[in-house]
Curated annotation (Swiss-Prot):
Organism: Pseudomonas entomophila (strain L48)
Membrane-spanning intervals of the chain: none
Pathway: Nucleotide-sugar biosynthesis; ADP-L-glycero-beta-D-manno-heptose biosynthesis; ADP-L-glycero-beta-D-manno-heptose from D-glycero-beta-D-manno-heptose 7-phosphate: step 1/4; Nucleotide-sugar biosynthesis; ADP-L-glycero-beta-D-manno-heptose biosynthesis; ADP-L-glycero-beta-D-manno-heptose from D-glycero-beta-D-manno-heptose 7-phosphate: step 3/4
A Gene Ontology cellular-component term: cytosol
Catalytic EC class: transferase
Protein name: Bifunctional protein HldE
Family to which this protein belongs: In the N-terminal section; belongs to the carbohydrate kinase PfkB family.
Pfam families reported for this sequence: CTP_transf_like, PfkB
Region (Ribokinase): 1-318
Region (Cytidylyltransferase), start-end ranges: 343-473
E.C. numbers: 2.7.1.167, 2.7.7.70
Length: 473
């Protein structure tokens, strides 16, 4: 299944559900309390993040999709914090504020990236389902997907009215379910329970075959369009009537914190479907997104560049011949891992042993090596008629096959100065016997604090000499 980045900017999504504030107290621990055998945390940072349905909306907006949110809060500073954070993220939020009842707050005490304690401040909201439904119906115009983010806190009480209102407008409804009665989601386009939520409804599943059988039965009983069971380290399983089960393995490189992973799944699904992706592709994108977000601390969102880089890794474009856009994203990812970027350039018309040795030496100057080559017209201007011997596509393909080379890109000018201004490598490398100040682009790299190095060339290795020798014979 080939993946590509959807046009999220054309994918408006409406989220309705239980909003909450995830509050974090960060601090150091160096002693045990004399009052009880518990650690003493000296708080030095307080952080607020949107949680629940608000985190779903935040994730959708972070992908670049227009996001609207309807929910219930108290009339307090926690609601104000939520509203401010969502506004800053570009989410349009409409809160039904209830007097004399607090906004739901999940307070986590953190030390050294570990959660020591969670304290919940909440009372289920006894909202009037008609009032919330009226807010939603007025917002459905122009929306491409409706998400029901249900945490069982009271904001969603008339699920069927919302589902039917969306279906009448042919708007897909995605629901992240809670509780032991999934019949309230009857008629939804897709529900996304995790494995424990799913087994609470259908009973324990001994293997995948039983999971599929019970899932298909649930689909038919509830008239669901599809069922996606998220299974932690075992990945995800997508079930649809009339289609084979689709099992996707987990994509996480490192699991650091699973808080909010379900929110990331449904938000990526919603944005992708709203952008016109079919369901299997949307699920594959959601699986990639979940693999990224579990590597972050606490409730977190995945950004469009992060998802784009994950797609590139999935499609094998993490190395090799890249476009400028792909290269800049790959560089961002490498720098996020504190990797040093090395850049060299040339025509590389006929690759020989001298080139290979030089590129290995260049690669040793850092962690990632970019090789930029002159395109065919540029080589012809530099070397004269009859050059290049090999086309730019062939030259790039050969270079990309070398173990020392990470990324290959071409440029049309005589020199790579324009490319250097955009790439901004940490190290510019050139082969030859001239001074550093004579290296083309040295002034550009040195101006932003980069390093320029000149490496010696292997003797008796020259493309021009090889070409002349061939012509004489």
């Amino acid at each position: 299944m080939k993946l590509s980045m959807p046009r999220f900017d054309q994918a408006p999504v409406l989220v309705v559900g239980d909003v909450m504030l995830d509050r974090y107290w960060h601090g150091g621990t160096s002693r045990i309390s004399p009052e009880a055998p518990v650690p003493v945390v000296k708080v030095d940072q307080i952080e607020d993040r949107p949680g629940g349905a608000a985190n779903v909306a935040l994730n959708i907006a972070a992908l670049g999709a227009p996001a609207s949110l309807v929910g219930v809060t108290g009339q307090d500073e926690a609601a104000d914090s939520l509203a401010n954070s969502l506004q800053a993220a570009g989410v349009r939020s409409i809160f039904q504020r209830i007097a004399h009842q607090p906004t739901i707050v999940k307070l986590r005490v953190m030390s050294r990236h570990q959660q020591l304690l969670r304290i919940d401040f909440e009372e289920p909201f006894a909202t009037d389902p008609l009032s919330l439904g009226e807010e939603v119906e007025g917002l459905l115009e122009g929306v491409k997907v409706l998400v029901l983010s249900d945490y069982g806190k009271g904001a969603l009480r008339n699920h069927q009215a919302l589902i039917q209102a969306a279906r009448q407008k042919q708007i897909p409804v995605l629901a992240d379910p809670k509780g032991k009665d999934f019949s309230i989601y009857r008629g939804a386009s897709l529900i996304t329970p995790n494995l424990s939520e799913f087994e609470a409804i259908v009973g324990r599943c001994a293997d995948e075959a039983e999971l599929v059988a019970k899932g298909l039965k649930l689909l038919e009983e509830l008239d669901l369009g599809a069922l996606l069971v998220t299974r932690g380290e075992h990945g995800m399983t997508l079930l649809r009537v009339g289609h084979p089960a689709l099992h996707l393995p987990a994509r996480a490189r490192e699991v650091f914190d699973v808080t909010g992973a379900g929110d990331t799944v449904i938000s990526t699904l919603a944005a992708a479907i709203a952008a016109g992706e079919d369901l299997p592709h949307a699920v594959a994108l959601a699986n990639l997104a979940a693999g990224i977000v579990v590597g972050k601390l606490g409730t977190a969102a995945i950004s469009a560049p992060e998802l784009r880089r994950a797609i590139q890794r999935e499609e094998g474009s993490e190395r090799g011949v890249l476009s400028l856009e792909q290269l800049l994203l790959a560089i961002d990812d490498a720098r996020a891992h504190n990797e040093t970027i090395v850049f060299t350039n040339g025509c590389f018309d006929i690759l020989h042993a001298g080139h290979v040795t030089y590129l290995e030496q260049a690669r040793a100057q850092g962690d990632r090596l970019i090789v930029a080559i002159n395109d065919d017209a540029s080589v012809s201007r530099l070397k004269g008629p009859g050059r290049p011997i090999n086309s730019v596509d062939r030259r790039m393909a050969v270079l990309a096959g070398l173990g020392a080379v990470d990324w290959v890109i071409s440029f049309p000018e005589a020199t790579p100065e324009n490319l250097l201004r955009q790439v901004k490598p940490d190290v510019l490398v050139k082969g030859g016997d001239y001074g550093i100040d004579q290296v083309v682009g040295a002034d550009i790299v040195k101006a932003y604090g980069g390093t320029v190095k000149v490496l010696g060339l292997v003797e008796n290795s020259s493309t021009t000499a090889i070409v002349e020798k061939i012509r004489k014979h």
